[in-house]
């Protein structure tokens, strides 16, 4: 199993080591960053608003949706956890623990239509972020921490696992793994990676990494590497795999700009694909598992895992920040790059 007690996601412990000593020293840039964190929603300069805990977190059914409360509370817990770790202010630590304990006690399940599968990957891993930071908080009893971990397994993991393996029966019905855009699988795989780290469970950690590195779905880099249309010859029906197309372009790392499966959707979705993947692999890196470099791609020389993702990062960032003359491979999903949401700051 990878090393324990490093951040499950986003390398926040690495950031803490670089930021925390600078704050009391009066480092101007560190203080500006801290103030930006402290005043950003949902904390908004104090300890934030409590949106309440729903017995069942629901997404996708009109009139029953309440998942917004969960993602706001998850962000609040994570933000307060970071602020406690950086400043030592137990007021923030108490808020983070209160939120985590409340969900462990009152939330009984996830609900909705097929969109229920978006809840673990877009909300659940943020609760895990907060818990990972707070695991050594002296005012969070070990018993409560253990109960929280079991809650995440019992209530959240089952939903993530069900999507990854069945995809709402589309695998059996359509005889392929490509019905859903890559973000669906990415989020659920990220959740599993994060949960495995939090709970020190190698099986769950490796299960999440399997779907990213070796799995058959659109979230997989392995499918990308085996994709017969990766060189851009002809129109691919669905754009299989996470990064289906490699465009030879001197502006990209090692001479390639890499088009992701989510490229062509609005910028919220396009940017989320890169963010979810980066979070999962940075989590792995923090555990001593260099997931990028352990991947190989035999189709294009030099396009190992790190170069594949770097080329995709350059591609996604270039378009979002204003570059228009990017190569694009049309596919069944989308006919071109989508400017909706372009240039916006995203959480």
Residue ranges: model-predicted function:
Residues 196-328:
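Long, repeat-rich segments with strong aromatic
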Residues 1-174, 186, 190, 210-213, ...:
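Extracellular glycan-targeting catalytic surfaces
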Residues 150, 179-192, 203-206:
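Active-site-proximal alpha-helical scaffolds that flank and shape metal-associated catalytic sites
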């Amino acid at each position: 199993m990878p090393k324990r007690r490093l951040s499950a996601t986003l390398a926040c412990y690495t950031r803490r080591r670089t930021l925390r000593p600078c704050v009391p020293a009066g480092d101007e840039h560190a203080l500006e960053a801290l103030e930006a964190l402290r005043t950003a929603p949902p904390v908004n300069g104090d300890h934030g608003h409590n949106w309440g805990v729903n017995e069942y977190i629901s997404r996708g059914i009109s009139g029953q949706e309440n998942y917004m409360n969960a993602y706001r509370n998850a962000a609040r817990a994570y933000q307060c956890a970071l602020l406690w770790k950086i400043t030592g202010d137990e007021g923030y630590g108490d808020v983070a623990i209160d939120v985590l304990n409340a969900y462990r006690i009152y939330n009984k399940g996830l609900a909705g239509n097929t969109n229920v599968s978006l809840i673990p990957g877009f909300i659940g891993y943020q609760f895990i972020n907060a818990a990972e930071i707070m695991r050594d908080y002296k005012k969070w009893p070990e018993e409560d921490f253990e109960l929280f971990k079991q809650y995440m397994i019992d209530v959240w993991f089952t939903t993530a696992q069900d999507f990854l393996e069945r995809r709402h029966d589309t695998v059996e019905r359509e005889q392929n793994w490509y019905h859903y855009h890559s973000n669906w699988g990415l989020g659920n795989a990220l959740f599993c990676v994060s949960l495995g780290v939090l709970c020190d469970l190698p099986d769950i950690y490796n299960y999440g990494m399997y779907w990213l590195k070796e799995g058959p779905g659109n979230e997989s880099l392995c499918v990308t590497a085996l994709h017969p249309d990766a060189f851009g010859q002809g129109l691919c029906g669905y754009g299989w795999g996470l990064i289906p197309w490699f465009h030879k372009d001197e502006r990209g790392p090692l001479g390639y700009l890499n088009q992701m499966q989510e490229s062509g959707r609005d910028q919220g979705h396009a940017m989320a694909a890169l963010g979810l993947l980066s979070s999962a692999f940075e989590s792995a890196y923090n555990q001593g598992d260099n997931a990028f470099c352990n991947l190989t791609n035999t189709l294009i020389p030099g396009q190992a895992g790190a170069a594949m993702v770097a080329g995709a990062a350059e591609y996604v960032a270039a378009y979002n920040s204003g570059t228009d003359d990017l190569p694009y491979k049309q596919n069944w999903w989308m006919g071109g790059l989508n400017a909706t949401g372009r240039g916006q700051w995203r959480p």
